Structures are given as structure tokens and as C-alpha cells.
Amino acid sequence: MKNSRVIMLLLGLLLIAAMVGACTAPAAAPAAPAGGEESAATEAAPAEGDAAKPYIPVISKGFQHQFWQAVKAGSEQAAADLNVDITFEGPASESEVDKQIEMLQAALAKNPAAICLAALDTKAVIQLLEEAQSKGIPIVGFDSGVDSDIPVATATTDNIAAAALAADKMAELIGGAGKVAVLVHDQTSRTGIDRRDGFVNRIAEAYPDIEIVNIDYGAGDHLKSTDLAKAVIQANPDLKGYFGANDGSIIGVLNAVTELGKEGEIVVIGYDSGKQQMDAIRAGTQAGAITQNPIGIGYKCVEAAVKTLNGESVDKIIDTGFFWYDATNIDSDEIKPLLYE
């Protein structure tokens, strides 16, 4: 009997222990997710699905103009649609070639899946593009092309044709004769070269009675461009037309025309959009401008990079289009979505 009592006592203790274990197990359950969350936070910031996304840095020519903000919006939309991660950056000024090269070097060091680049100086980046090629990193150009076969594609406006259209409009508006000046953002990027040459060559070929008296380069800087334009207007009191090859350039021209009281005397034609240009066109101070499709440029460059990574073929040149706009169509359904303030 004594042994029986001992056995019963042991069985009772085991039963109590089992009951206590059963009661305390649910209390421990909430701790598992908390522990899991802490582990995920310390091991890697992105979720498991995000870690598998291709990373594509997008390096632009600048960040200061609304044009680049529109390109950024397009590239971000493409990233969301196509399930890739991007970063978008550019130097503070479109004259900072060295800064852009540093950005490209930093991007290469991260070993990205691909790189989208709008080169400020097409020759200065060749060595880094060759490095990317040796690492198997595809390069997609946007806005500006590069004088190299390394980029698999370039999403861009046909700037030569677009600037030629601006020249045709200028000739029409000044009556086919007179003095005209040109203000360009730079002479090193593909856009600067092509817009200058597209305008100048069209005038030379088709309008022998129009004289281009000056070509300046203002780095897209408003103050510098204003000073350059004022000097040209003061040196040429009979100037009939002024072409600005990007938003920063044309703002300088508009500032100069306004400050010198030349509104209505000089036909002003610009490129891109932005609030100051749009207001000037509506007010009649500016005749019109060429608009690109900046959102489309941003979207198409990321899309081309993703297609390349997926083994799909892409066109070497992706023409994103251009349009002439003035007071008659600035608010039209065709033009309005392409403009930005």
C-alpha cells in the first residue's frame, strides 16, 4: 500500500505538471511574432520580396529644374509598374560634370543590375561606361546620348529635329529676315550640341536672310543666362529673335527682355516648360516653345533597362517625341499633360 501511495503521488505530480504546461503554452505564443519582427529588422531592412528586386540607379544631369522632377516622376512610375528599385539623383548644377562622375562611380560600386544615365559630358564618362560593360552592367541613356556604342538604348527626344522646328517657327515669326541670338545650356552634352546645331543649321540651310549674331552657353543657370542675354541684347539693339535651348536658358532670356523693356520687340522661343515660360507664353512675352515628354523619358529609360535585364530586345534609340506649343494650344488635351510648372 505504501508503494501504491507513492506511485499515485508521482502520477498526480505528473498530471499537475502537464496541466501547468498546457496552460502556460498559449501565453508564450505572442512572443514568437515579436521575436520574428526584431530579427527581420536587424538582419535586413527590406522585406524578402524587396530584396529580390533589381536595383537601377538613375543619374540625371541635374535636379534644379522642374524638367528633371518630371523625369524623376516617370522613372518612379516605371519602377512601381515593373517591380524594381531605383534611386534618382543628379548634381545641383548642370555644370558639375565632376560631381556627376562621382555619382556614377558610387553607383558602379554598388554593383547594380543596370544604370540609367543622362551624361553631362559624353566624353568624360566613357571610361566608367567601359567599366560597367566589363562588369556586365547594362547602361541605358536618357535625355542625352553618349558618343559610344556601350549604351544598349537611349530614351531621348530627337533634339536636332525639334530645334529645327524651333528655327522654322522663329523664321516665320520674324518674317524670314533679321538678327537672331542663341543661348544654350552647354556644349558638352548631346542635348546641348544637338539643339544648338539643329537650330543653327536649319537657319543656315533654309533662311539666308537670317543672321545668327551670337551663341552663348549659360550652364542652365538663371543668373548667368540673364547676364549673357542682357549683354547680347544691349550689343544688338536691332535683335529680332532669341532662342533658349532649355528651361534655364530661356528664363535668362525672358529676364533680360523684361529688365531691358524689350517685351514685344524680340521674338522669344524656348524649350521645355516650367511656370515662368508658361506664364510668359500666356502673356505674350514669349512666342512659344518646344516641349518634350519628360515623364515619358523617365519611364522609357527604366523600362528599357528592365527589358534588357529580362533578355528582351530594345531599340537603340527610343524616340519619346516633341511638340510645338504656344498660346493657341498650351491648354489643349494633347499638350497640357506634357507641361510642368
Model-inferred region functions:
Residues 6-24:
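Sec-dependent N-terminal signal peptides of Gram-positive bacterial secreted proteins and lipoproteins
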